[in-house]
């Protein structure tokens, strides 16, 4: 029943966003708007993804690996794996867990510009206990952060509710809805944050490497209609 209600909540938000019409600024690139559910990670290798690490001399294969149908990231050195393509107007789904200890990580959406640590993007936080927070990076902006208030701490916009994460070692689910200049995030089906009037409306999607061992699975993108 809880899983069913979570799906209903996400569907309701998507339906509302589809009724919102706003102007979308482009940068000359043609982002992909998904027409069907697409697995972004094929479960076998990193086809369709590019790895970037702060230490250019580091071996990416020692940071990112595939085992037992999972993506495993050591968290060191800092960096990310990102999609080769840009995307717009989608629901992004990823599942993650901390197999050893609690740590820091995140999903970057609307990533653009040069590969660096950290690139222009909006981070949807995965830091233990804080999944659902937003962080603005390298000039990107959302209205909720720009206006300030009790939820804003530096570049961070704190999530709306208490943590909805599962205990350490268990799998969590992130659903990130991007529609025009809105970004809406659900953690295990619980609505945790809403960003509006985002300065960027498309870009690449990144999974961070940021200090602790983390595992990912079931990474896909879906259309909003």
Question: What is each stretch, according to the model?
Answer:
Residues 1-11:
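Bacterial N-terminal signal peptides that target proteins for export
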Residues 9-19:
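Bacterial N-terminal signal peptides
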């Amino acid at each position: 029943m809880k899983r069913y209600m979570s799906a209903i909540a996400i569907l309701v938000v998507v339906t509302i966003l589809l009724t919102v019409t706003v102007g979308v600024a482009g940068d000359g690139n043609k982002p992909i708007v998904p027409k069907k559910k697409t697995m972004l990670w094929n479960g076998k290798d990193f086809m369709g993804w590019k790895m970037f690490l702060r230490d250019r001399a580091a071996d990416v294969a020692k940071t990112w690996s595939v085992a037992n149908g999972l993506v495993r990231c050591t968290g060191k050195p800092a960096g990310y794996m990102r999609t080769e393509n840009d995307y717009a107007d989608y629901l992004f789904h990823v599942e993650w867990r901390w197999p050893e200890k609690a740590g820091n990580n995140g999903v970057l959406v609307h990533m653009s510009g040069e590969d660096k640590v950290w690139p222009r993007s909006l981070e949807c936080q995965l830091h233990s206990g804080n999944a659902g927070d937003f962080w603005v990076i390298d000039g990107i902006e959302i209205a909720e952060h720009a206006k300030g208030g009790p939820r804003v701490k530096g570049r961070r916009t704190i999530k709306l509710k208490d943590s909805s994460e599962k205990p350490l070692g268990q799998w969590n689910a992130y659903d990130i809805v991007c529609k025009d200049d809105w970004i809406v995030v659900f953690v295990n089906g619980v609505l945790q944050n809403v960003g509006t009037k985002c300065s960027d409306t498309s870009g690449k999607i990144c999974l961070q490497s940021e200090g602790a061992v983390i595992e990912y699975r079931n990474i896909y993108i879906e259309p909003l209609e």
